[in-house]
Amino acid sequence: MSILYEERLDGALPDVDRTSVLMALREHVPGLEILHTDEEIIPYECDGLSAYRTRPLLVVLPKQMEQVTAILAVCHRLRVPVVTRGAGTGLSGGALPLEKGVLLVMARFKEILDINPVGRRARVQPDRKSVV
């Protein structure tokens, strides 16, 4: 049982083979950094709420939006759930991974895309930190 996913209520997740998902991502998403060993994955088993921990099947760290699109396409085709994570600093458990899922880490997306000082708005990528 996971704090975020209860099979009795949400339905069973399909059983997936780590190696099959790893090979499909390597084949369809060139240049993607994929973490798959326990040593690599352990730091991603929780966010800032460290009371709850779940190791994901794989952790992927894309550098380009095209890679994100390809990751989601592969995971959809293989019926593998995806949890998206920024810097992992949240304290609500919103980025806790699923044991049978891929953790999509968006920490490399830090750009400011647009600033509208008149409208007091900014459009930024997911891991852009505010500077006051």
Where is each model-derived feature located?
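Noncatalytic alpha-helical scaffold of FAD-dependent oxidoreductases
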Residues: 1-85, 90-132
